Amino acid sequence: MSRYLTQLDDELCWFPDPEHALEEPNGLLAIGGDLSPARLLAAYHKGIFPWNEPHQPLLWWSPDPRGVIRPEQLHIGRTLRKFIRGTSFDISIDRAFNEVIAACAAPRRSASGTWISTPMIDAYRQLHRLGHAHSIEIWQEGQLQAGLYGLSLGRVFCGESMFSRIDNGAKLAMVALCQHFARHDGALIDCQMQNDFLATLGIEEWPRRQFLTTLAQLSRQPLAANCWQTGSILL
């Protein structure tokens, strides 16, 4: 199949087949468009997500291979288990979405900023208000210390970003997501791409075609009705 970069129409929420994505940079498929809820949902349902540096135009990606985690197969190492047993924390869902995405967008120790621009923040906050985007929060003594956010598509959760102000906080947020999602019939977490952090948690790399086929099936299947009800999570 031929590979090319597509310029998106500003009005039509359409995307090309992800199999046309470039090999280098891996998965770059399209440029332009906007971050409207309709376009974002159309993208995620096709296995496409936006990512660009603040100085770049809006770019859309569908990498091959695709990083995924099956919730019931999350790897919890000995050190993490000890941390979970020995640390006092509270875990919640959708209690502080705005604060989580703002923390994810804040500069990191190793970089001057992140890819999460103000338009990105506004777009995902709108998806949250519409019931599509959700967050997991880790609290200690009433202070938000870690969390993650992403989109729910049926039995698939598309993870977007996470942050942590404490050791193992981001891993704890992932454990909470996987256990909660699995208990409510969730089947797959899309992590987009492999990295060293996710490798410690048991991420798998699937060929893009396998991921897209599975996404098409699972995104049409319902979760338990109360999966994303605001409240607390128990591990």
UniProtKB/Swiss-Prot annotation:
- In this record, what's one Pfam family? Leu_Phe_trans
A GO MF annotation of the entry reads: leucyl-tRNA--protein transferase activity
Record has Isomerase as a keyword? no
Q: What is its EC number?
A: 2.3.2.6
Swiss-Prot/TrEMBL keywords: Acyltransferase, Cytoplasm, Transferase
The record's subcellular locations are: Cytoplasm
Note the InterPro entries from the entry. Answer: Acyl_CoA_acyltransferase, Leu/Phe-tRNA_Trfase, Leu/Phe-tRNA_Trfase_C, Leu/Phe-tRNA_Trfase_N
Q: What is its main location?
A: cytoplasm
Q: Briefly state the protein's biological role.
A: Functions in the N-end rule pathway of protein degradation where it conjugates Leu, Phe and, less efficiently, Met from aminoacyl-tRNAs to the N-termini of proteins containing an N-terminal arginine or lysine.
Q: What is the lineage of its organism?
A: Bacteria, Pseudomonadati, Pseudomonadota, Gammaproteobacteria, Aeromonadales
| Alphabetized HAMAP family for the sequence | Leu_Phe_trans
Q: Does the keyword Transport apply?
A: no
One GO BP on record is: protein catabolic process
The record's catalysed reaction(s) read:
N-terminal L-lysyl-[protein] + L-leucyl-tRNA(Leu) = N-terminal L-leucyl-L-lysyl-[protein] + tRNA(Leu) + H(+); N-terminal L-arginyl-[protein] + L-leucyl-tRNA(Leu) = N-terminal L-leucyl-L-arginyl-[protein] + tRNA(Leu) + H(+); L-phenylalanyl-tRNA(Phe) + an N-terminal L-alpha-aminoacyl-[protein] = an N-terminal L-phenylalanyl-L-alpha-aminoacyl-[protein] + tRNA(Phe)
Q: What top-level class of enzyme does the UniProt entry assign?
A: transferase
Q: In which organism is this protein found?
A: Aeromonas hydrophila subsp. hydrophila (strain ATCC 7966 / DSM 30187 / BCRC 13018 / CCUG 14551 / JCM 1027 / KCTC 2358 / NCIMB 9240 / NCTC 8049)
The protein here is known as Leucyl/phenylalanyl-tRNA--protein transferase
Q: Which family does it belong to?
A: Belongs to the L/F-transferase family.
Q: What's an example GO cellular component term for this entry?
A: cytoplasm
